[in-house]
Design a protein with these regions (language model features):
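Protein kinase-like catalytic core scaffold
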Residues: 136, 173, 195-196, 240, ...
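Phosphate-binding site of ATP-dependent enzymes
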Residues: 150-235
């Protein structure tokens, strides 16, 4: 069985995945996403890295960032059409590449998300913020790990940021701020399996790790588990991380990330080898597909 791991930037995360994958798969190939090209003919299509055709692989695990989302959309579609196992459906990266779009899709499927507004106009944003009520969360529609996420407590804080975002041609997404006690939970969905850790910060309302949050053991409710599973299913992810908060007694999804952070520290807190479970899941699906073909 052959697995390719596609990555946007070299990091210890990909090295950890490679180590675990080599324990399970017969052959493992690391592929930089900027080294790929598509070849479309009348009767065939190929996804090439040098002279290697990834459509001949059993499984491909894709980890990318927001800069490569459009490329990832075409990539996962080409691989899925050729029968290669991936962790995403054809439409998944169109959802992940736009935070407002993903929230819209989740809401349309009955999943709790903060009320959101999407606009190109700073003036419209100011008016919308009054309707949402301060404080409001300001987001660029792209970005992961807390990038491009700010909070405004008043119009005087909001307007300059909106003007700056407009000058840099950034699309604007506003969200209502949900009180959650400074803690959110990263729920990792791998098939039907759910595992999690919480992230807490006393000094920053953004509790994500890159924003200064600390990983702590999570207390998952059944509602949170089911909400994360449904969110993954709606957006087409077989493997993903869902950022979940509890507010007003209900779980709310803040974001879905296919390239969520992984580390040995995370494994220790959760009490499971998450990376190994990711690789095992890819292997299980590839093996089942081969048996059925």
């Amino acid at each position: 069985m052959k697995l390719a791991i596609i990555y946007g930037e070299v990091s210890t995360k990909h090295q950890l995945i490679m180590e675990r994958a080599e324990e399970i798969f017969d052959s493992v190939l690391a592929v930089p996403i900027d080294g790929l090209k598509f070849l479309h003919g009348e009767e065939e299509q190929k996804v090439l890295y040098k002279d290697i055709d990834l459509t001949e692989y059993d499984a491909v695990y894709i980890r990318t960032d927001d800069r490569d989302m459009m490329f990832a959309e075409h990539l996962v579609e080409a691989l899925n059409e050729e029968g290669v196992v991936t962790q995403a459906s054809n439409d998944t990266y169109s959802y992940e590449s736009n935070k407002f779009y993903s929230m819209k899709v989740l809401a349309e499927n009955g999943i709790n998300v903060p009320d959101s507004v999407y606009t190109l106009s700073p003036d419209v944003a100011v008016s919308a913020a009054k309707e949402l009520g301060y404080p409001v969360i300001m987001k660029t529609v792209k970005g992961v790990g807390g990038e491009g996420v700010m909070r405004a407590s008043s119009e005087s804080e909001l307007k300059p940021v909106m003007d700056t975002m407009k000058s840099f041609q950034q699309e604007i997404c506003l969200q209502e701020f949900k009180e959650h006690g400074g803690t959110d939970t990263r729920v990792i969905v791998i098939g039907d399996e759910v595992m999690a850790y919480s992230r807490s910060s006393d000094d920053d309302w953004r509790s994500n790790i890159s924003g200064g949050g600390e990983r702590v053991e999570a207390q998952l409710t059944e509602k949170m588990k089911e909400t994360a599973r449904r969110a993954a299913g709606v957006t087409g992810f077989d493997i993903c991380g869902c950022d979940v908060i509890e507010s007003e007694g209900e779980p709310f999804i803040l974001e879905i990330n296919g390239s969520f952070g992984i580390s040995k520290e995370m494994n220790q807190i959760i009490g499971q080898d998450v990376v190994l479970r990711i690789v095992e899941r890819m292997h299980e699906r590839a093996l089942q597909k081969k048996r059925n073909s």
